[in-house]
Amino acid sequence: MVLVLVFQGSISVRAQEVKLGNVAGLAPLPNILFILADDLGYGDVSCYNRDSKVPTPNLDRLALEGMRFTDAHSPSTVCTPTRYSLLTGQMAFRINYRNVFSGIGGPCLIKNNQLTLPQMLRERGYSTAMTGKWHIGLSFLDQGGKLITKPDLEGVKLVDYSRAISDAPIHRGFDRFFGTACCPTTDFLYAFIDGDRIPVPPTKLLDKTKLPKHAYSVDNRLGMVAPDFNLEEVDMVFLKKSREFLESHVLRSPKKPFFLFHSMQAIHLPSFPAPQFNGITKTGPHGDFIHQLDHIVGELMKTLEKLGVADNTLVVFTSDNGPETTSVVRMRADYGHDGAKPWRGVKRDQWEGGHRVPFLVRWPNNVAPNSSSSQTISLTDIMATCAALTGATLPNNAAEDSFNILPVFLGKAGGKPIRDFTLHQTNSLALSIRQGPWKYLDHRGSGGNRYEKGELAAFALPDNAPTALGQLYNLETDPGETKNLYFEQPLKVKELKAKLDELVKAGRSAPVMR
């Protein structure tokens, strides 16, 4: 691991904006472990889906020991925009970004002077670390020192691996980073980044003939692979590195709080579970991969317990978007398991299955055990919540779409909604807005996947308003989004569309002077 001090100028300025103490009145400040799954659906976790065919005992234990949110949402229906929004508290459509990076990916979507979640926490005295998939963009240089702009495999072959990455996570608020540029087993560059370097560069083309072949091994592209990079062991390597950080930190700085962002590969296709998990469930390689994810969560919790810090660590577990199309279609057909259940839609779709995600919080003596919340929340809310938790003051040009949900964690929100409105976006930059039970989609169709043909055609629903320019659903009476009320409720359509336009133009949805 590499320890680097960055942004000295901006830290000195922002330090003046930070309150002393912490708003929650908690001393000492808690550690924070944030675990982000990849493409894990609402129905993939057994505490959310009684009919799940895959056991997830460690996630179920998290729910029993903490709070389970039933109306939590990723800000986007695909990876990169969600990750950007999580670490900045800002919707990615505000920087006109919608899709995902691949290969070396970049440049970084987060501006050099933009306040991030880890930077904010570091300014409050936290040691900050990230392990796993970054996927928010990096800048690699060629042998002439020029920024590489060519995509995919062609760009990977141009990288001068003796040069540092100029906008790595350690330049955006993390003290330490070990992980990958994009999807670890998908995207052209199969190598680990340590700090701002790739210590073991890729030396040869990936030999795909040696990888598992099955219905869930799709989405693995030909790329350059490093000698130490085993595609079936990536998540176990990430687990090892996160454990090492936790053990080292508690040994060397027992009184200093930590923020660890553990960003998994699982369960993004291809489903390449580590060998010890092959066949552990009766639901094929993808089910085994889900079980491996659950195992990793359990191992991280065991590490906290072994180190004696579990009771003063806020643990948050969630997913970056809904489940992938192929995994849902195949798992339904092969094993009767539905990762999107009970919602309509999958990853990329504006319907609930594309962005309603599992969200679990554990914090002994603060978050009530075996509790649940139906508050509508977004992953963008993490930044404002951590600001409230640690006493940081958010400037008005930061975390523009982040709401403080700490009162919900602490059981002090009452029945009042934290959010009046919640925004969503898809990989086509289609937008939607939610207010209470009402959800307005400012577009036709899913906003992402095509249901006219292909593997999703069998799951297309009849369109009762085919000429409508948008969609309106009442999730209280129609949680499956089966009946478009666009023509039946014209005033509600007008109201929500106007509010959506207003929030887009305003540049923020969160209140000022939080």
Positions of the model-derived regions?
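Bacterial N-terminal signal peptides
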Residues: 1-8
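Formylglycine-dependent sulfatase
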Residues: 15-471, 477-514
